[in-house]
């Protein structure tokens, strides 16, 4: 991806396994990661009874191979790790449509994270994002979730 900077901020586009890009923003000595649509999108199909091969995704109207898609996602994390292994703040999708926490858990297993902020969960309800808190607590990672649109935090 490309990058842009001035004397106050540096913004770099990094990969995604979906349309668009993810972002690394550096400012005031902090490194912020915005995942965009980067996630383990088909994690919900990786259940105990999954036998491999293609699975039909009714949401997207296509056949997908969840194992192959997970490898693509993990490959993107590997590429980002070539740039850095830590972030002050991470904004990452945690959504019931995609298996809730698997992608975010894989992210915090790969990187040092100062604060995790879930996103993309409004369609599945604000409470769905709280499923991630037990995993951030286990790693002593601060967790902040909005309770309504317009909420903000100073960190």
Regions found by a protein language model. Name each.
Residues 27, 90, 142-144:
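Generic alpha-helical hydrophobic packing signal
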Residues 1-5, 101-155:
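Binuclear metal-ion centers of metallo-dependent hydrolases, dominated by the metallo-beta-lactamase
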Residues 13-16, 20-22, 90, 104, ...:
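Small-side-chain structural scaffolding
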Residues 15-19, 95-99, 122-123:
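Short beta->alpha connector loops
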Residues 88-91, 114:
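Conserved acidic residues
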Residues 75-80, 97-106:
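A short, acidic, amphipathic alpha-helical segment used as a generic capping/interface helix at domain edges
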Residues 36, 93-96:
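Structural motif
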Residues 1-85, 148-155:
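Core dinuclear metal-dependent hydrolase active-site scaffold
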């Amino acid at each position: 991806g490309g990058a842009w900077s001035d004397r106050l901020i540096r913004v770099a586009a990094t990969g995604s396994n979906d349309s668009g890009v993810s972002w690394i923003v550096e400012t005031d000595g902090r490194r912020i990661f915005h995942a965009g649509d980067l996630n383990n999108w088909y994690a919900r199909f990786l259940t105990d009874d999954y036998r491999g091969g293609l699975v039909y995704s009714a949401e997207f109207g296509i056949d997908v191979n969840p194992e192959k898609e997970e490898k693509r996602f993990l490959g993107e994390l590997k590429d980002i790790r070539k740039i850095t292994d830590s972030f002050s703040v991470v904004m990452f999708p945690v959504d019931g449509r995609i298996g809730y926490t698997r992608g975010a858990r894989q992210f915090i297993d790969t990187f040092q994270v100062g604060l995790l902020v879930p996103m993309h969960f409004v369609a599945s309800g604000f409470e769905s994002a709280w499923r991630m808190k037990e995993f951030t607590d286990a790693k002593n990672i601060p967790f902040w979730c909005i309770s309504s649109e317009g909420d903000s935090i100073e960190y």
